[in-house]
Amino acid sequence: AMAAVEALKAAGYRVAVCTNKPEALAHTLLSRLGVRDAFGAMVGADTLAIRKPDPEHLFETARRAGGDPAMCLLVGDTDTDRKTATAAGVPCVLVSFGPSGADMAALMPDALLDDYADLPDIVVRLIGAA
């Protein structure tokens, strides 16, 4: 996963975390994994007065990372992620290997991700070059 994040950053994309986990917990998890600094922003469930599926949660995450909310996409693993992307009017990539597994295909994402190595090409296809 981190190779894909680094490839996206090297190509000029902004990469951030928009999660419904409490911000402190998300920060702790990413820090313990040694990857917190790889993300330009992290917005948790309690960072703002709203959370996913409210699209403003995603938009504010993009802004805090220095990106354009109109040019973002959401990579996720839940029905809430799909609802957030739909509400935001942005492409949605759902992983087939998350908690809901193959059931993600039924949510009709713009792309279904089977391997993080494919993510940079999917991003270019869905939103264009950075």
At which residue positions do the language-model features occur?
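Alpha-helical phosphate/pyrophosphate-handling elements in metalloenzyme active cores
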Residues: 2
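Asp-based, Mg2+/Mn2+-dependent phosphohydrolase catalytic module
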Residues: 6-10, 22-23, 27-130
